[in-house]
Amino acid sequence: MQKLLSVIPSVDKLIKQLAGIALIQQYGHQAFVAQARQVIDSLRQHILTHQSLPVDQPADNLLSLIATNLQQTQQIAMKKVFNLTGTILHTNLGRAIWSEAAITAASDAMRHHSALEFDIEAGKRSHRDNTISQLLCEITGAEAACVVNNNAAAVLLMLATFAKGKEVIVSRGELVEIGGAFRIPDIMQQAGCKLVEVGTTNRTHLKDYRAAINENTALLMKVHTSNYQIQGFTHSVSEQQLVELGQEVGLPVMSDLGSGSLIDMATFGLPAEPLVQQKVASGVALVTFSADKLLGGPQAGIIVGKKADIEALQAHPLKRVLRCDKVILAGLEATLRHYLLPDQLTTHLPTLSLLTQSIDHLRVKATRLQNSLSKRLDARYHLQIEQSLAQIGSGALPTERLASLAVTITAPTQRDLLQLEQQFKMLKYPIIGRFAEQKLWLDLRSVAQFDQLIEMLEEK
């Protein structure tokens, strides 16, 4: 045992070797020492446990293993992946892909000084939300708009500004929870207001709102149940009905759309999603929605509505805490400008482009992917093109599915499939699919930059 342990080199010895010196120059002394200690400890533990040297880890080749480990630890964690899950707006994979115009605008904002809060024509300071507000007003018909860093922040700012220390009435069937345990009741608590639930889970009437109103009521609130749907014996109150009640009793109505859409998705043959423009036209005081979901832009929370209410939001101390930086604003501005030319949206917005692909187009992709994979995989794996059902994702239209095609992979054992999935994850750009029906599904509707995927698979 002692003889085996004696072959383990010291950290100091590794540092003095030429290969060790080169690694220190490349990765730094601290990182090298940490990895060296880890490799040495692992080798020592193996000897103590098995009373032998590991076959795949010779004691005289530790520097090679250290180099491999250092290379892996230095890789950027948020690396590019190919999304073949069938979920287009996959929250865990970054949601919307930016348009080329948005990427260019954001890159320019990073490289140069910009007129972030400067009115060039007037030669004086301006507000960073001004341009975004003007675009949103033109697109939605709202009087004014402001931007924060996500939709949860938009809801928080709205509640903190208008309902702190007071009551907000919401239907019990609209108390949503989204990914990451974000809950409307929790946001209300953080904003310092009291939630008043009305109605039941499946049925809420206008009389329920009316009965709950008192001198402490600050807001009537509608929350779009974007990530679930209640069906069957149901009844809900529309924004228009709430607005009429609010006007009668002198209370504003605010609507959280969650995902939100600026275009009628049905015109592209897609399931309909509530339009921001419709909520504004109904008289709702403020509407909140996300920029990185159906809108197809960077992460941001957008609030549109009455000018006086937007001004109150801008004046609240939380607005500065939650404001967006120049890069996000540049990307969002470029994204919104696409909506001024709605006929070109499917060309410029990657999200909409993916959503509107024809089955014939997907079949061509599926055939190419099947051919590329068949050259790469051994005889254990059987590849087949099958019909699939994709989804939009990020809480948008949770019960709706989009017709799609996928390359499915089966194997003699589940272990073989898991090994293949792991191999896909170890590629230069990991391939992320999904498991179902004892198959690995690679759905073509959700994958962007398809040609690059094929090039990677066919690299020698």
From Swiss-Prot:
For whether the record's keyword set contains Transferase, the answer is yes
Q: Which GO terms describe its cellular component?
A: cytoplasm
What are the N6-(pyridoxal phosphate)lysine sites (modified residues) in this protein? Answer: 293
Q: In which pathway does it act?
A: Aminoacyl-tRNA biosynthesis; selenocysteinyl-tRNA(Sec) biosynthesis; selenocysteinyl-tRNA(Sec) from L-seryl-tRNA(Sec) (bacterial route): step 1/1
**BP terms from Gene Ontology:** conversion of seryl-tRNAsec to selenocys-tRNAsec; selenocysteine incorporation
Pfam families noted in UniProt: Se-cys_synth_N, SelA
Q: What class of enzyme is it?
A: transferase
Single GO term (MF): L-seryl-tRNA(Sec) selenium transferase activity
Q: Per the record's keyword annotation, is Cytoplasm included, yes or no?
A: yes
Task: Kindly list the cofactors needed.
Answer: pyridoxal 5'-phosphate
Q: Which SUPFAM superfamilies match?
A: PLP-dependent transferases
The catalysed reaction is: L-seryl-tRNA(Sec) + selenophosphate + H(+) = L-selenocysteinyl-tRNA(Sec) + phosphate
Localisation per UniProt entry? Cytoplasm
Q: Which Gene3D superfamilies match?
A: 3.90.1150.180, Type I PLP-dependent aspartate aminotransferase-like (Major domain)
What function does this protein fulfil? Converts seryl-tRNA(Sec) to selenocysteinyl-tRNA(Sec) required for selenoprotein biosynthesis.
Q: What is this protein called?
A: L-seryl-tRNA(Sec) selenium transferase
